[in-house]
Amino acid sequence: MKTKLTEQSYWVDVQGNINLDLADDNIIKLWIEKNLDLSNINSCIEIGCFPGRYLTIFGNNRIELNGLDFIQEVKFLKQKFQENGFVAGSFINADFTTYVPEKKYDCVASFGFVEHFVNWEVIFKNHFNYVSNNGYLIIEAPNFKGFFQRLPRFLFDYKNYKRHNVKAMDLEKWKKILVENKFEIINAEYFGGYQLWNENDSKNRYFLKIKFFTEKLLFKLKDTLCPNSIDNKSFSCYLGIIAKKTNNNEY
């Protein structure tokens, strides 16, 4: 049974080369720094770490950086991080679905990863095997499930939409899984406001015109229904959870 919604070749094309550039006002970076004291963390691993930019969030706090990815170029990340003054550990070229971790880390993170699998709950739980006792887990995904996010993607970026398992974009299910496995929830929320992006590079002027007016209408409708722009599952572009592993956790 096929469990992956994307192929390795897709990620090689999309991610390209190593890239450690991450803006200071990056939404995901700000969300993590707001909700987690990084000074308590000594080591971190990112699952699906290539091209490397999100690891800089932790590296800027002198945390040892580690990563796992099935893209072969991941093996060059250690040298690149060291050249840029970061503390680098191991960078593993392996398939997360079959790899058995040899050690555990103070913090385990993945960004836009779990939703690319049919069996997303298994993938979600596999993260637990990497987390040390009293360590932290960070999981983030785009929110394609909310109406204001789902409709334009379904209409105008369907190919990319189908690369994602929308069922995985469920914060309540994430919380339930973590609580059942003896994790303490530190933060769980939809965030990022209402933003839209897509991978459809069509230049058809009729397509672009319809897309423009549809998105304009959605923005107006969102502002009417949610005038205070409070983040929620209907329109926010991201969902994320930060949790702490307790000592009595079986993983």
Residue ranges of predicted features:
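Conserved N-terminal segment of class I S-adenosyl-L-methionine
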Residues: M1-K103, C107, F111, F124, ...
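A short hydrophobic/small-residue beta-strand
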Residues: L65, L137-I138
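Short N-terminal helix/helix-N-cap motif within the alpha/beta-hydrolase-1
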Residues: P101, F117-V122, Q149
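A short His-aromatic
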Residues: G112-H116
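A short glycine-rich, Lys/Arg-flanked "PGG" loop and its adjoining helix->strand segment in the class I
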Residues: E121-Y136
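Short, glycine-/aromatic-enriched active-site segment of Class I SAM-dependent methyltransferases
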Residues: N143-N165
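A C-terminal cap/extension of S-adenosyl-L-methionine-dependent methyltransferases
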Residues: R153-F154, N187-Y251
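Short alpha-helix
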Residues: V166-K182
